[in-house]
Amino acid sequence: MSEAIFWGGVLRVAQSVSQAAPFILTGFIIAAVFRRWLGPQSVRKLFGEGTWRSLPQAWALGMLLPVCSLGVIPVMREMKRAGLRGGTILAFGLTAPLFNPLSVLYGLTLSEPFTIFAFSICSLVVVTCIGLLFDWAFPAKVEQEVHEESVPYGIKRILSVFVSMGKDFWSYSIVYILIGLSGIVFLNVILPKASFQTSVNGGDLWAPILMTGVAIPAYATPMLAMSQLGTMFQHGNSVGAAFALLILGAGLNFGIIVWMVVAYGWKKSVCWMVVLLGVVLGLGYGLEKPLYPTDIDPADHSHAFDVYCCPFSVDQSHLPAAVWQKLEDDVRPEETFGMISLFVIALTGLMFLAVERRFNLERWLTSSPEITDEKSRSMDVVLPNWVLAAAAIIGLVAVSVAMCFAYYPSPEECLEEIFIVKGEVLSAARSGHDSHAMHWIPVWEDWNRRIQVGVYLREFQLSDYQRMKARVVADYIELLEHAIEDDDQEEVKHYATLLARAHSRMVRAYQTVSKESAE
Amino acid sequence: MKMNPTGFLTRVAIIVMLSTSVGCLADNPEESGHAEHVIPEHKPADYVSAVEQLEIRTSNSLPENSEQRQQLTDIVGWLPELAAQTDLPKADWDRIQELSEKYQALAKQQDAKLLIQEIQADLDELKQLAEKTIELDAFNTYDQKELTDE
């Protein structure tokens, strides 16, 4: 038993680290840009500090910047250093991990795009309400913690960002991030494999409360949270629980809570948490009926939360090999890039810290360059720091938009991928190679979602016809999965046949669009 | 009241370690059997059966009880899904969805009489589409070929 829990914890933490790596990297970049290029005054200006716009502005910036609830920690710490008010920081910290361009696109192709619109408006209500209450109840004037010399133009200005990122890696930020990850271990210990499948069914009054308990320690990237919402709506699970999952699962973790207690003390943190939970649960129960999907057959379960439970059962063996295999299957190229980048940042951070023992790096970075050639200097336009910072932040947003097109390819490309995956699943299912089929089924489910987003991204619409064809395929994939789990060969063959037919129909539905758009 | 980060983090680490240890000692309940999709008994197997059901259920007078009314509402709601499991082209599917939405709106208004009248009025069209699905499914035999190839 303890072996399953141990290796389960190893797998869950490794999965979370790999998923979080690109977002943590982004968080360190944003924090360094805020510190070195923008500076405290411009950061306060960016967030509209002291004006009525500060909370909605924090919400809007949070929607644009691609960070998760772990990656947002360095940014929140930097915002506090810049002297922003608690309400604004917490509003940004809670919203930034909920949405990004990729996840919003994904959400808009769900059966009820209005739901995502309603959820995002409700998230604005949540952050505005608790931000206003927080700043009203605790109006203490926040002092800027440190005064920093600005970095002069030239190579030092670029280098200073890397120095900041490296040093930030070896600061309390990484401790809070590790505390955030401890929530995953905690859930792995208390939730046995697949034990949360039937806990948040639609109509269950306790579902939002139960989900709240799981969502706070859980870690979910914006994409994971959005795909879980999709699965919940597909299965007719509780809408209130889905809302709690989005706000608390994607937006909050143990690391943020601990940082908040350290930064603001127990009293303010408890008040903030109580108001947050009250508003989230209140809205969750309020949304339950109006947003409940009417065009689905409610299932009595959901697989969406299997990722929060222990991945292994007591009787499973060869767990280290299973962990390795799962990681090999799951880790995406962008996650590998994120992890390697973080490793490089960690190494350079160590190097900078070692250099600082013998040499005053900060003084060198902030000392002005000697201008030797006035003539060439006149041709060399020095851009102000805020221009570079704006370019960096807009660049991050632009990269995340470009990533949308890479992550959600054209329908033709998706269909080619699906064709390969379909062959793997159906031939493995029919020939009794269950583990092979079960490995490829989530891949097919993923491409089935991505083709819909890919069409939406390029056509700015997805017809109900295409959406329904994809839904029929998704339903049959799940029925086939259950048949394989039951080891019922007759059912496997039956659903494999139906799935193949549904796939052919879906291909025709999406090929028509491809041809029309080509013409 | 601000806290000393080091002291506070040490306390948090101890709490997390303790709670994790307690969790490890506790019995891990047996993994629950995996859940199933419950398909309602009155859900027709395909679009053709759904149209047959609509004809039967609207041939008599009003539904006798709320359960029958609910079942009728369910069936009209399933029409687009069942039609998507056929080879009907987009235009035909769109029409079925349009009719389904119209029926569901009437069902929401609790006007069973009007709902039945509307279904009866559209029944010929629904039947024609059902016949078309049979023809198309018979014509499109490539699925079977594809299965054999695999």
Where are these regions (language model features)?
Chain A
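Selected transmembrane alpha-helices and immediately adjacent juxtamembrane segments
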Residues: M1-V33, W37, Q41, K45, ...
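Alpha-helical transmembrane segments of multipass membrane proteins
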Residues: V33, L102-Y106, S182, F186, ...
